[in-house]
Swiss-Prot record:
Pfam families: ABC_tran (PF00005), NIL (PF09383). SMART domains: AAA (SM00382), NIL (SM00930). It is found in: Cell inner membrane. It comes from Xylella fastidiosa (strain 9a5c). It is a peripheral membrane protein. This is Methionine import ATP-binding protein MetN. Its EC number is 7.4.2.11. The gene is metN. Residues 2-240 form the ABC transporter domain. GO terms for molecular function: ABC-type D-methionine transporter activity; ATP binding; ATP hydrolysis activity.
Length: 334
C-alpha cells in the first residue's frame, strides 16, 4: 500500500547539507499496524510526514496504492490528504469546543451541516466522548484530548492513519486506553496505521511489523515477534533491553556467581505454558538455575523468556531437546 523507493530527505543548515533520512526502501502493507522506532533524531518524524508530504522528499519515489505521490499537483495532494488522517503528540486542538474540532476537517470538504453534525455525533460516540461534545479542550484530560484528536483524524473516512508519538505525553493507564482504541480502529475499520515511537513497549502491544531507524538509516525491519525476540542490530537490542528493564552490568555480575552454561530460552505461543524445562532436565540429567524470566504478549501472541544456567548431566543434549521442541536458544555463556 505504501512504498518507499530510494526515498530520502536532506536539509540545508548553515550552508551545509544535513541528511535526515538516507535512501529508504520499504513497503507497508494495507490493513496492518506498522511501527517506526528510533531515538531522537533518528528520522522517524521525517519518514512519517513524508507519507502525507508534510515533509517533501528530497529524492526517490513514494507510492500509495501504486500512485507516486511525489509528482502530485496541489489538487492531487489535497485529495491524497483526505485519505490520510493524522494524530499528533501534543493534540494540536483548536480552542473551540470538542464537536467543533471534529467538524473542522469536514467543513474544509464543503459537507453540509446535516452531514457534518451526523458524522461528528457518530465519531464522538465511537471514541466515548458523546457527553463532551460541548466541552472545551482546556476542560479535558490528556487522554480525552487525544481521543478528540483521533475522532478528528477519522472524520473524512481515511484509509491511512498516521500517529506521531501519540502516547508519549500520556500516563501509563491512559496510554493503554489509547492503544486499545487504535487497535479497535485497525480491527473494525480496517485502517492502515503507521505510528512512530521511541518506546518498544508500544510496538510490542499494538504493531504487526516494525522498522528500526538509527541516525537516518533503516537498520532492521520485520515482524514484531522476530525483531522483538531476536533483535539483530545493537540499536534494536538496546530498545528491547530498555523495555525489559535489563541492567547489563548487574546481569554480568549475576553470571559471575553461577556455574555452567548460560542460555536464554524463548517460548512463543502455547509453548509458553508447557513445563518443558522440567521435562528436559529429567531426560538429560541437567540441573538448571533460573536467573531471570518473564511471560508477556506481543500483540495477542504470548511469549516467555527464561535465562538459565545449565550444569551437570548433558547440557548439549538439553539444548538439542529444547531446539527439537521449537524453543529458540541463545547461548550467553558457553
Amino acid at each position: 500500500m505504501i512504498q518507499f523507493k530510494d526515498s530520502y530527505k536532506h536539509y540545508g543548515a548553515n550552508g551545509r547539507e544535513v541528511t535526515a533520512l538516507q535512501p529508504l526502501n520499504l513497503e507497508i502493507h494495507a490493513g496492518e499496524v506498522f511501527g517506526i522506532i528510533g531515538h531522537s533524531g533518528a528520522g522517524k518524524s521525517t519518514m512519517l510526514r513524508m507519507i502525507n508530504r508534510l515533509e517533501e522528499p528530497s529524492g526517490g519515489h513514494l507510492l500509495i496504492n501504486g500512485q507516486d505521490i511525489t509528482v502530485l499537483d496541489r489538487m492531487g495532494l489535497r485529495a491524497l490528504r483526505r485519505q490520510i488522517g493524522m494524530i499528533f503528540q501534543h493534540f494540536n486542538l483548536l480552542s473551540s469546543y470538542t464537536a467543533g474540532n471534529v467538524a473542522f476537517p469536514l467543513k474544509l470538504t464543503g459537507a453540509s451541516d446535516a452531514k457534518i453534525n451526523a458524522r461528528v455525533a457518530e465519531l464522538l460516540a465511537w471514541v466515548g466522548l458523546e457527553a463532551h461534545a460541548n466541552t472545551y479542550p482546556a476542560q479535558l484530560s490528556g487522554g480525552q484530548k487525544q481521543r478528540v484528536g483521533i475522532a478528528r483524524a477519522l472524520a473524512t473516512r481515511p484509509q491511512i492513519l498516521l500517529c506521531d508519538e501519540v502516547t508519549s505525553a500520556l500516563d501509563p493507564q491512559t496510554t493503554t486506553t489509547v492503544l486499545q482504541l487504535l487497535a479497535r480502529i485497525n480491527r473494525e475499520l480496517g485502517l492502515t496505521i503507521v505510528l512512530i515511537t521511541h518506546e518498544m513497549d508500544v510496538i510490542r502491544r499494538i504493531c504487526d511489523r516494525v522498522a528500526v531507524l538509527d541516525t537516518g538509516r533503516l537498520v532492521e525491519t520485520g515482524l514484531v515477534t522476530d525483531v522483538f525476540l531476536h533483535p539483530q542490530h545493537p540499536t534494536t537490542r538496546s530498545f528491547v533491553m530498555e523495555t525489559e528493564h535489563i541492567d547489563t552490568s548487574a546481569l554480568d555480575q549475576d553470571f559471575s556467581l553461577v556455574n555452567g552454561r548460560i542460555v536464554r530460552l524463548t517460548f512463543i505461543g502455547t509453548d509458553t505454558y508447557l513445563p518443558l524445562l522440567g521435562r528436559v532436565a529429567r531426560e538429560t540429567g541437567v540441573d538448571y538455575n533460573i536467573l531471570s524470566g518473564r511471560i508477556d504478549r506481543i500483540k495477542e501472541t504470548p511469549y516467555g523468556q527464561l535465562t538459565v544456567a545449565l550444569s551437570g548431566g548433558d547440557p548439549v543434549a538439553a539444548q538439542a531437546a529444547f531446539a527439537a521442541a521449537g524453543i529458540h536458544i541463545e547461548e550467553l555463556r558457553a
